[in-house]
Amino acid sequence: MSREKWDIYLRDRLLALVEETNAKVLTFDGVVPYPGVIAAKNSNPNLKLVWVRRGLWQKKPQRYVLGLQSAMMDKIIEPGDVARAYDFGPTSTRKDAVLTSPVSLFRKADAMSREDARKALGLDQNRPTVLVQLGTGDSDVNEKMTAALSGLLGWKDLQVILTKAPVDKNGNTLAPDGLDLKVVRYFPLANVLHAFDAGICATGYNGVHELLPAQVPTVFVSNIRGTD
């Protein structure tokens, strides 16, 4: 599907959903509001558009684009960030957003104990366990996954837990031989974070604001491509 057709399709799908649910507000959580999202708002004068615009953007020239995108919104919400003091990106000096507390699915009261979390995930209670959340896709991201997994080879009796199979787009494994790997599906993962002795995670908003409050010793690996 071409980009133009996709934008039209997204607009029409959103408008149909708004009509079906009688929604009054459309919320976009992302870096760049898609043309289809903007088109949906422009096609329905009664629809309010809210942009959940996270901070810590890369320090790249925005010219007029950021201001134009922001002006199209009825409201902008910026989720707080534990690293906000180090935000020197183009949104850091803007005064057009409502700042909230950091948003996280981790709640101490809801988090399982180490024992219960390991039972829920089917893990050995006594072996060391590491969570790896790095994603896959482009070659540079795949290389980081392979490097991270290779670095764990010397850890005796280690259980390595992933939320996605470590394979490239062609189905080739990114993991070295000699690791005990397990892919888990559990939501919300924040409730079972006490199962892990350590983590290797992409520096995404959700990962940072779940693993840090859960006090899981974690190596955060940044991806500076594109809008990441």
What are these regions (language model features)?
Residues F28, Y186-D228:
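A donor-sugar binding/catalytic signature common to diverse glycosyltransferases
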Residues M1-P90:
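Active-site and donor-binding regions of nucleotide-sugar-utilizing enzymes
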Residues K59-P61, A83-F88, D140-V141, V167-L174, ...:
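Short, charged/polar "capping" segments at the starts of alpha-helices
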Residues V31, D81, G135, G204, ...:
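Short glycine-/small-residue-rich Rossmann-like dinucleotide-binding loops
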Residues R54, K59-K60, Q69-T136:
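A nucleotide-sugar donor-handling region in carbohydrate enzymes
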Residues M112-A198:
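Donor-nucleotide binding loops and adjacent catalytic segments primarily
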Residues L68-S70, Y86-R94, D168-L179, L211:
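Short loop/helix-cap segments at secondary-structure boundaries that form the rim of catalytic
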Residues A23, M72-D74, R94, L179, ...:
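Short, well-ordered alpha-helix to beta-strand connector turns
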